[in-house]
Structure formats: structure tokens, C-alpha cells
Amino acid sequence: MLSRRSFLNTSFGAGVALAAPAAQQAAAQTPAPRPARRIVDAQVHLWKANAPDRPWPPNTVPQLPQPFGYDQLLPMMDEAGAERVVIVPPSWEGDRIDYAMEAHAKHPTRFGIMGRIPLADPQSAALLPKWKEQPGMLGIRVSFNAEQTAWLRNGTADWFWPAAEKAGIPVMFLAPGNLPIFAGIAERHPRLALIIDHMGLSIDIAKAGEREEAVAQAAALAKYPNVSVKLSSAPTYSSEPYPYRDMTPFIRRLYDAFGPRRCYWGTDMTNSFAKATYRQRIAHFTEELAFLSEEDKDWIMGRAIVGRLGW
């Protein structure tokens, strides 16, 4: 039997000895595999049917003719590779959050909630100190559509901003066309996390050809560190099929203004249900936006919203 010294003195042994350091060096230079990207959807509406035992407010219209529940959503998430979803209870159900809480109770690792409150009632301030003690509750979403827009100007909503700031509650807000008002709110309440919904866009704004102006309003709020933006519902506001190239300049403008750590991907899928599959909505950002680095995608596709909401 050859000793180690005798083995190394052979030509074969010398080759092995020389190859070993080279193999070790090559292994050291091989980059470690990237960790799996977390896909966290910053907005989906879930709702139950309008029924006598669970009535909706009058004259409200859902985004789909049939209810859309978590049992329908979960297989879509699994097929597309989405880890979590932020449930935003829809306005047509009023201010109730019971179905969102049911979804979280049954699937606590998959669903978080941005709840709703009766914003026009100042007594709702009593709900805020313990708001986030509710299971799955991440923050509050407020909407300013149609007649609710006046609440931003007539003092109706004034009580809410300092109360939410004091309670440490992140706020998502839908106020298309009215974003300049939030410059003052952001400045007066620097510890209040404010999240712009849907890039500042709406269907009416898109139809009117005013997307550029609305996105500019959103970008102007990037100067405030406590403001961030959901790059959500892109198919809804596009006039083109997948991959929605007409939306790229708007997404790029907000990415440049806010940076990837203050931008959040989201589907808002029921608002444009027939325009894209769940997988396409993910691939739009992970495969079709060439200006995003892999690290940018990690932040925008999930890491940033999880951090902002403390999830």
C-alpha cells in the first residue's frame, strides 16, 4: 500500500494535489444561490355576498358580479408563488372587516389586513389605540372617492391623521387627483407612515388621459420620508395587453422618485380580473421591467411592504 508521501510522488498523485487548491478556489468564487424571493401582494379585495344578515350600504357596486373569497384566492397564490396577501376590505361592504379577519383566522401566515373605520365619525378615534392588537391587523386603509373627497377639505378627516400617528398605525390612502393635500399631512405628521394607493391613479383618470399628471402628483410626495407608494393595479390603468408597456414610464418615474424600498407591488386583481392571470401580474414586474435589478425586485415584490407594515 502506498503511503501518502509515496502517492504524492507519483504523477497521478501530484495531479490530484495540484487540482485540489484549484477546485477550492473555484468553489470559493462560485456565488451562493440567491435566497427565494418573497412575493407579497400589497392589495387584494375579498368580500361576501350582499345578504339580509350582512347587508352592504345602499348604491354600492362590487368590482365583480360574484363574491371573491379567500378560498378562491389561495389556489391562485399557490400556483403563482405568492407567499402572502394584504387584504383590503372593499368599500362596497362599508366599514366592516369581519370577513378579512375570518380569512386571517383560518390562514394566519398568508393574510394580513389593512382595516377600515368610520372615518366621518370622530368617535372612531377610540378604536385606534388598540387597533393593531386585533389579530392580523396591520393598519388602516382610507378612501376619498366622490363625495368623500370633501372630507379632506372640510375638516371631517382632520382628527384621523394625528390619532393614527400617535397610535403608530400605517395608513394606505386612495385619493386620486387629490394627492397635493397629503403634502401638508405628511409634513405635519412625520411619524405617520402614509402609503399612496395605485400610483395615484384611478379608472376615470386613465380614461381621461391624465395618468401623467396623476403620477406626477404621487412622485412629488417622495420628498417626505414617511410617504411610500403602491405600484399596484397596473393592468387596470393600461390600454394595452400584457406586458402593459404604456405603464412602464409611470412605474419607472415612481421607482426613480421613491426608490425600491418605498415601492410595493400589488395586484388589486379584482379591479381588472380578466386582463391578467396572477402569474402574469407577478411576471410583469419580475421579467418585463428591465430597469429593475434583482435586488430591486426583492424589495418591491415583498420585502419592502413587509418592512413598512411591520409584518
What are these regions (language model features)?
Residues 2-21, 30-42, 62-84, 252-253, ...:
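Mid-to-C-terminal alpha-helical segments outside catalytic/metal-binding sites
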Residues 43-47, 198:
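Histidine-centered divalent metal-coordination motifs
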Residues 47-67, 205-207:
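Acidic/histidine-rich helix-loop elements
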Residues 74, 101-102, 129, 183, ...:
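Active-site phosphate/pyrophosphate- and oxyanion-stabilizing loops and adjacent acidic/basic residues
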Residues 83-84, 93-177, 184, 228-234, ...:
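Active-site gating/metal-coordination segments in enzymes
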Residues 95-110, 247-256, 281-288:
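Short, electropositive alpha-helical surface patch
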Residues 138, 151-264:
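Catalytic pocket-lining loop regions of alpha/beta-barrel enzymes
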Residues 268:
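Active-site glycine-centered loops adjacent to acidic/histidine catalytic or metal-binding residues
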